[in-house]
C-alpha cells in the first residue's frame, strides 16, 4: 500500500510541476510564485499551523481581480490532474482496480469453500446474473468533454512512463506530450458557455460507450470466463452477456421541459445511428480477418455458390452492406427527411447476431476455435450487450402529469373530473377502460399543450422498435392508479406489447406505503395477467434523504425493499428493484460492494438495476480498464449477495432502527423545515443561488421557480452543501439519534449491529466518509465572510452537532480516527485537501465580492463571476462527488 501511495504522490508532484511550468510560460513568474506561496501555506495550514492558516486567508482575501482567475484555475486544474493520476493508480499494476477482477476469483473461491453450496448451485447463480446500468445525465458532471479527452490521454502517458524499460528518447517524447496536453488544458476554458441540450447529454453518453464500454465489456467477459474456467471448469456460453446499458439521457422528462417527444424520437434514432457506426468498424475488422476458406456444409448452404470461395468474408460483406444502408436511412431521418425503409434495414438484434453466430459455429466446427474466440466473439458479445439500439432508454415522467391528462380528457368527455375522484373510483374507471375494446381518445379532441406532450410521448414509445425502450418510470408514484394510468395511456397510443412500468417511490411516506400500493396492484386480475410474473419497482434515494434525512431515509428504503421482496415472493412474481442512487452519500451513493451486501436478503434475485450518475460515470467507466474493474466488483457482490445473503436483522435491531429513524427525522426536519433561520442561512452560507448560473445540465435546478428547500431538486441541495464543506444533508440527524440510543444504554447493541449487520455497518462507513470530507474551519469561514451575524449561532450549532456526531460514530465503530479501515481513501482525501482548501477560501471571498456588488446595485465584475464558476468546478473535482 505504501508503494502505491508513494507512486501516486510522485506522479501528482510531477504533474503539478508541469502545470507550474505551463502557468509560468503563460502568465509569468509572479503568478506562479503567488500560486506556490498559497500552496505552501495551505499545506502548512493542513498540518495545523494556525499562523499560516491566517496568512492563507489574508493572502486570498487580498488578491486583485486580475489574479483571481489564474489562481482559481491553477488549483482547479491541479485537482483534475490529481484525479487523473489517482484514476491511473487505481488501474496500474499496484493499484486497487487492478485487483478488482480478482474480486471474481476471490468470490468464487469463497463460495466454493461453503459446504452448503454445490458447484452446480454456483453455476446456476452465474447463469442468472443480470446487471443493468442506467446512465443518467446528472448536472453534476461538471468537467467538459473536451477536457475529459485530454485527461484520458494524460492517463495513457502515465501508463507508458511506468514502463521501466523505455528508452530515454521515448521517455522524453512522453514528457513532451504530457506538457502539450497540460498546456492545451490550461488554454481551454473549463466552464461551458451554454447549458447542454438533452441531445448533447445523450451524445456524452454515446461517447462513454464508444471510448470505454465498447472495449471494456468484452474485456470484462473474457476476465469473467477465465475465472469461471479456472475455478469451476465452466465456460460462459457465447450468448450469455449478463450486463446491459440503458440511458435516461433524452428520456427523462421529469421536471425537464426541454425533453419532449420529438427529442426522445431524435435520441432513439441517434442511438441507432451510433450503433451502426460502431458495428461497421467491427465488421470491417472481421472482413479483413475472416479470410478462411474451410466451412461447414451449413455455412456453405447459407452463402450459396456466390460466396463459396470466401464464405466468412461473403457473410461479413453482406452484413456491412446492410449496416451501411441502415446508417444512411437513419442519417436521412435525423435530417428530417422521410425516406421509404430500405431493403435489409436492421431493426432487431437477431439480424446482426445470426450471420455472426453462423460464422462462429462454423469456425468452431472446423477446428478454428482460436479464430472464433478472437474479435468475432467480442463482436457477438457486443451484439448481446448493445445491439441495434446501442443503449435502450427509459422514459420517466411525474405521476401528476398523467393524472392531469386524464382529468382533462374526462372533463372533455363530460363524465366527471378524474383528478377529483377517489382512488377507488379512479381504479374502477381505469380497469374498465383497460378491458374495453373501443378507443377512449376522441378523434377530434384538441388537448392542452401539456396533455398533448404526454400523449405524444406514449406515441413515440408505441412506434419505437420493440426493445429500444426499456421501461416507463413514474416519479412521485403514490397510488395503484398512478401505475394503471400509464398502462391506459400506452394502450390508447396503440402499444403492441407489455411495456415494463416502474413506480418510483421517493418520499418517506411513499416508501412506507410502497408495499401496500404493490399489494393492491397484484390483487387486480387484469394487472396480474399483463405483467406475466415480472415487476420492476424503483426506490428513490435522493428525494427521500432530502425529505427526511439520511438515517430515516435509508431505513425506509431498507424496509420498503424488504416488504416488497416478501410480497412478490408470496405472489410468485419476479421482482427487479431499480435503485436510484447518486454519487454522493446524501443521494444514496456508497462503494458498490458494500452497498449491495447491505441490502435486504433476496433483493438481487431479479438482478441489479441501478442508476450511474453524472460524474460517477467517468470515475467508474471512464476507461476500459476501469470498466472491467467496476463490472467485476458488481459481479462479485451480486453473486455473494444471492448465494450468501446477509442475515435477517434481529427484531431488537429493527426496533433500534425504528427509534433512530424517528429521532433523526425529527431533528432533521426541525432544522430544515421548522427553523425560520434555516433557509436564509442556507442561501447565504452556500453558493446555492450562484449554482443556478452554471450551465451544467439541461434540467432546471428547481421543480418550481419559487419556494424553499422543498422545491429544490435533491442535486443542487447536496451540491451547495458540498461546496461549503459542511456536507449537511449527508449526516444531519444521524449522529444525534445514535447518541440518544447510546445514552439509553444500548451502545453494546449498536456495536453488535455494526459488527454483524452489513446494512448498519455500511451506514456508519458512509457517515465516516462524509465526515472525512467535511471541514468545520472552512464552513465557519464561509459563515464569517457571507452570513449575517444574527445567523451565526445557527451555523455554530450545526458545526457543534457534527463534532459530537463524529465522536459517537467512532465510539460505536471502535475506531480511533475516521476511515481507519480505508486508508487508501483517507490518503486520497488528504492529498486533495491541500489544493481544495484554497479554492474554498477563494470561493467565500468571491461570493462576498459578488454579493457586495449586487447590494450596492452594481454589475458584478466578470472576472469575479468567471473565477467563481471555476472554484465551483474545482471544489467538485476535489470532493470527487458533487451532488
From Swiss-Prot:
GO biological process: carbon fixation; oxaloacetate metabolic process; tricarboxylic acid cycle
GO cellular-component term (any): cytosol
Top enzyme category: lyase
Catalyzed reactions per annotation: oxaloacetate + phosphate = phosphoenolpyruvate + hydrogencarbonate
Entries under InterPro entries matching the protein: PEP_COase, PEP_COase_bac/pln-type, PEP_COase_Lys_AS, PEPCASE_His_AS, Pyrv/PenolPyrv_kinase-like_dom
Highest taxon of source: Bacteria
EC number per UniProt: 4.1.1.31
Catalytic residues in the record: 138, 546
Sample GO molecular function, one term: magnesium ion binding
Alphabetically ordered keywords of this record: Carbon dioxide fixation, Lyase, Magnesium
Stored Pfam families: PEPcase
Cofactor(s) of this protein: Mg(2+)
Record carries keyword Magnesium: yes
NCBIfam families linked to this entry: PRK00009.1
PANTHER family recorded: PHOSPHOENOLPYRUVATE CARBOXYLASE (PTHR30523:SF6)
Known function: Forms oxaloacetate, a four-carbon dicarboxylic acid source for the tricarboxylic acid cycle.
Similarity section: Belongs to the PEPCase type 1 family.
Protein name (Swiss-Prot/TrEMBL): Phosphoenolpyruvate carboxylase
Amino acid at each position: 500500500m505504501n508503494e502505491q501511495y508513494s507512486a501516486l504522490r510522485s506522479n501528482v508532484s510531477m504533474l503539478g510541476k508541469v502545470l507550474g511550468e505551463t502557468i509560468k510560460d503563460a502568465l509569468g513568474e509572479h503568478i506562479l510564485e503567488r500560486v506556490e506561496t498559497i500552496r505552501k501555506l495551505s499545506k502548512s495550514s493542513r498540518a495545523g499551523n494556525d499562523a499560516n492558516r491566517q496568512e492563507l486567508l489574508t493572502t486570498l482575501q487580498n488578491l486583485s481581480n486580475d489574479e483571481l482567475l489564474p489562481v482559481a484555475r491553477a488549483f482547479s486544474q491541479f485537482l483534475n490532474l490529481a484525479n487523473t493520476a489517482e484514476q491511473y493508480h487505481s488501474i496500474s499494476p499496484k493499484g486497487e482496480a487492478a485487483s478488482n477482477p480478482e474480486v471474481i476469483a476471490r468470490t468464487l473461491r469463497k463460495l466454493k469453500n461453503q459446504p452448503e453450496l454445490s458447484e452446480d448451485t454456483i453455476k446456476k447463480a452465474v447463469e442468472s446474473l443480470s446487471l443493468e446500468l442506467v446512465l443518467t445525465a446528472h448536472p453534476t458532471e461538471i468537467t467538459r468533454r473536451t477536457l475529459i479527452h485530454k485527461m484520458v490521454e494524460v492517463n495513457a502517458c502515465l501508463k507508458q512512463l511506468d514502463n521501466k524499460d523505455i528508452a530515454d528518447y521515448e521517455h522524453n517524447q512522453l514528457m513532451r506530450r504530457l506538457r502539450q496536453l497540460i498546456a492545451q488544458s490550461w488554454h481551454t476554458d473549463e466552464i461551458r458557455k451554454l447549458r447542454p441540450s438533452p441531445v448533447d447529454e445523450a451524445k456524452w453518453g454515446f461517447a462513454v460507450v464508444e471510448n470505454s464500454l465498447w472495449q471494456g465489456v468484452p474485456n470484462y467477459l473474457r476476465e469473467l470466463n477465465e475465472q469461471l474456467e479456472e475455478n469451476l471448469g465452466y465456460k460462459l456460453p457465447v450468448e450469455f452477456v449478463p450486463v446491459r446499458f440503458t440511458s435516461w439521457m433524452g428520456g427523462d422528462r421529469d421536471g425537464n421541459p426541454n425533453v419532449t417527444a420529438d427529442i426522445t424520437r431524435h435520441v432513439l434514432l441517434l442511438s441507432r445511428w451510433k450503433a451502426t457506426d460502431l458495428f461497421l468498424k467491427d465488421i470491417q475488422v472481421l472482413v479483413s480477418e475472416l479470410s478462411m476458406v474451410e466451412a461447414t456444409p451449413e455455412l456453405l448452404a447459407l452463402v450459396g455458390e456466390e460466396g463459396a470461395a470466401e464464405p466468412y468474408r461473403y457473410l461479413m460483406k453482406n452484413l456491412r452492406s446492410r449496416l451501411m444502408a441502415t446508417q444512411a436511412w437513419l442519417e436521412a431521418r435525423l435530417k428530417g427527411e422521410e425516406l421509404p425503409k430500405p431493403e435489409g434495414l436492421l431493426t432487431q438484434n437477431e439480424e446482426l447476431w445470426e450471420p455472426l453466430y453462423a460464422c462462429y459455429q462454423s469456425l468452431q466446427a472446423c477446428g478454428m476455435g482460436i479464430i472464433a474466440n478472437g474479435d468475432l466473439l467480442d463482436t457477438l458479445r457486443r451484439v448481446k450487450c448493445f445491439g441495434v439500439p446501442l443503449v435502450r432508454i427509459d422514459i420517466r415522467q411525474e405521476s401528476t402529469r398523467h393524472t392531469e391528462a386524464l382529468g382533462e380528457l374526462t372533463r372533455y368527455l363530460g363524465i366527471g373530473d378524474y383528478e377529483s375522484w377517489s382512488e377507488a373510483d379512479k381504479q374502477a374507471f381505469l380497469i374498465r377502460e383497460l378491458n374495453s375494446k373501443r378507443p377512449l381518445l376522441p378523434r377530434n379532441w384538441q388537448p392542452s399543450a401539456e396533455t398533448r406532450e404526454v400523449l405524444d410521448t406514449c406515441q413515440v414509445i408505441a412506434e419505437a422498435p420493440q426493445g429500444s425502450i426499456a421501461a416507463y418510470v413514474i416519479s412521485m408514484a403514490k397510488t395503484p392508479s398512478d401505475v394503471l394510468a400509464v398502462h391506459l395511456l400506452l394502450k390508447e397510443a396503440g402499444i403492441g406489447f407489455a411495456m415494463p412500468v416502474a413506480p418510483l417511490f421517493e418520499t418517506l411516506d411513499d416508501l412506507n406505503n410502497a408495499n401496500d400500493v404493490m399489494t393492491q396492484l397484484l390483487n387486480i386480475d387484469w394487472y396480474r395477467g399483463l405483467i406475466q410474473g415480472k415487476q420492476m419497482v424503483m426506490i428513490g434515494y435522493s428525494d427521500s434523504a432530502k425529505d427526511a434525512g439520511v438515517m430515516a431515509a435509508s431505513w425506509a428504503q431498507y424496509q420498503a425493499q424488504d416488504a416488497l421482496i416478501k410480497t412478490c415472493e408470496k405472489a410468485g412474481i419476479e421482482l427487479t428493484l431499480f435503485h436510484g442512487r447518486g454519487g454522493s452519500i446524501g443521494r444514496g451513493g456508497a462503494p458498490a460492494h458494500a452497498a449491495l451486501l447491505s441490502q435486504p436478503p433476496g433483493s438481487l434475485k431479479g438482478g441489479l438495476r441501478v442508476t450511474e450518475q453524472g460524474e460517477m460515470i467517468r470515475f467508474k467507466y471512464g476507461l476500459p480498464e476501469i470498466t472491467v474493474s467496476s463490472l467485476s466488483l458488481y459481479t462479485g457482490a451480486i453473486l455473494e449477495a444471492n448465494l450468501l445473503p446477509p442475515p435477517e436483522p434481529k427484531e431488537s435491531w429493527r426496533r433500534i432502527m425504528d427509534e433512530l429513524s424517528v429521532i433523526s427525522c425529527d431533528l432533521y426536519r426541525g432544522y430544515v423545515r421548522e427553523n425560520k433561520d434555516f433557509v436564509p442561512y442556507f442561501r447565504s452560507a452556500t453558493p446555492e443561488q450562484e449554482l443556478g448560473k452554471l450551465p451544467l445540465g439541461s434540467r432546471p435546478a428547481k421543480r418550481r421557480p419559487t419556494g424553499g428547500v422543498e422545491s429544490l431538486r435533491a442535486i443542487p441541495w447536496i451540491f451547495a452543501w458540498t461546496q461549503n464543506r459542511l456536507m449537511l444533508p449527508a449526516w444531519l440527524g444521524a449522529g444525534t439519534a445514535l447518541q440518544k440510543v447510546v445514552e439509553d444504554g444500548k451502545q453494546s447493541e449498536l456495536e453488535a449491529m455494526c459488527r454483524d449487520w452489513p446494512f448498519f455497518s455500511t451506514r456508519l462507513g458512509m457517515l465516516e466518509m462524509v465526515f472525512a470530507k467535511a471541514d468545520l474551519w472552512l464552513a465557519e469561514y464561509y459563515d464569517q465572510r457571507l452570513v449575517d451575524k444574527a445567523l451565526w449561532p445557527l451555523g455554530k450549532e450545526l458545526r457543534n452537532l457534527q463534532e459530537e456526531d463524529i465522536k459517537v460514530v467512532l465510539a460505536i465503530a471502535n475506531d480511533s480516527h475516521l476511515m481507519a479501515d480505508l486508508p487508501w481513501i483517507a490518503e486520497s482525501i488528504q492529498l486533495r485537501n491541500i489544493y481544495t482548501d484554497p479554492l474554498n477560501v477563494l470561493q467565500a471571498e468571491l461570493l462576498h465580492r459578488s454579493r457586495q456588488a449586487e447590494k450596492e446595485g452594481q454589475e458584478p465584475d466578470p472576472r469575479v463571476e468567471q473565477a467563481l464558476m471555476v472554484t465551483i468546478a474545482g471544489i467538485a473535482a476535489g470532493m470527487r462527488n458533487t451532488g
